[in-house]
Amino acid sequence: MTKLVPPHGSDTLKSLALEGNALTVELERAKLLPKINCSSREEGDIIMMGVGGFTPLEGFMGKADWQSVCDNMTIESGLFWPIPITLSTDNEGVNQGDEVALVNGETDEIIATMVISEKYSIDKTHECNTVYKTTEIEHPGVVMVMAQGKYNLAGSIKVLSDGGFPEKYSSLYMTPMETRAYFDDKGWKTVAAFQTRNPMHRSHEYLVKIAVEVCDGVMIHSVLGNLKAGDIPANVRSEAISVLIENYFVDNTILQSGYPLDMRYAGPREALLHALFRQNYGCSHLIVGRDHAGIDDYYGPFDAHNIFDEIADDALMTKALKIDWTFWCHKCGGMSSMKTCPHSAEDRALLSGTKVRKMLSDSEDLPETFSRPEVAKVLQAYYAGIKDEDKVEIKLNGHSAK
């Protein structure tokens, strides 16, 4: 019998993906249905519902749920949910009661079928203000919301695609059922998830090792969906993380895996979503460091810590493992945090993924206070293969500029 935390709001995972003959029959039927194009973010949400990562959702949210999530961080039933999971369209021809095929907006591949239970409009500015705490169009999350269609479509879905993630990422891509089976096989009860969209530098390594000390194991969980321009591709990140695990962690304490969502860059609210779906993956804790899921200086460095104190005690079973600002201290001779290092700012080398990418993009060597040499070698090889005209300018803003 499992010792892991149960799925969110349910005794069992709710995987919406069809298999076998049911999948074959539904795919054929879907070819005859009206098509709704999906964005990359929407497709990632569909795949996540397919594998049960968004348990207990059965499809896209209606207006009452959208409003309640924006205003109260709960769906209408009262169940905790921090970010709206919605589907949009400009299609005037589909209406409540219609059945539609949801397709990849670029390839036309059928991803899912849906029975439309509601067609409604939203106040996009309200969603941006409540979820992202800004309406500035420079924010990538605001860009996503403002690019949505005129209408939202709600309804239950049947998922007919895995998005190609298993083929592209092989064993790195694991479903909640698979990670839970892995944890059970290892006999782990407490598992901390480490969310990353970057290769792991020394500060990340330090955070994970703190978690290894207090939990049975750690799942390093990488974003496999779309990121912003200039971020490092998942295959490169995975290789860099693998060499770190092989050389600097004890065997059988770490699982590296990935999940299919796009980043929303919603800072504190996204930290809550990260904890919620990690509960579905079987994790008892989420490591929350500096500026979790943030971008530039839209959020305070520890807003994602504070938001966990603002929700009800029973909102989530997965708890935040909050860790203070970490850095290399020359006087301490190693990694430290604000809680453990008594020295001054002049003695500290503050680390960030943005700062590492900036140095790599500028063809600078990474000091060992920033990165393990094995990791640096992988990243330098990747950046050496990027043509100058294809490089994205990386600016140090907000916390990364310190």
Curated annotation (Swiss-Prot):
Keywords: ATP-binding, Nucleotide-binding, Nucleotidyltransferase, Transferase. Belongs to the sulfate adenylyltransferase family. SUPFAM superfamilies: Nucleotidylyl transferase (SSF52374), PUA domain-like (SSF88697). One of its GO terms (molecular function) is ATP binding. The keyword Nucleotidyltransferase applies. It holds the Pfam family ATP-sulfurylase. Its EC number is 2.7.7.4. It comes from Ruthia magnifica subsp. Calyptogena magnifica. It catalyses: sulfate + ATP + H(+) = adenosine 5'-phosphosulfate + diphosphate. This is Sulfate adenylyltransferase. NCBIfam families: PRK04149.1, sopT. Pathway: Sulfur metabolism; hydrogen sulfide biosynthesis; sulfite from sulfate: step 1/3. One of its GO terms (biological process) is hydrogen sulfide biosynthetic process.
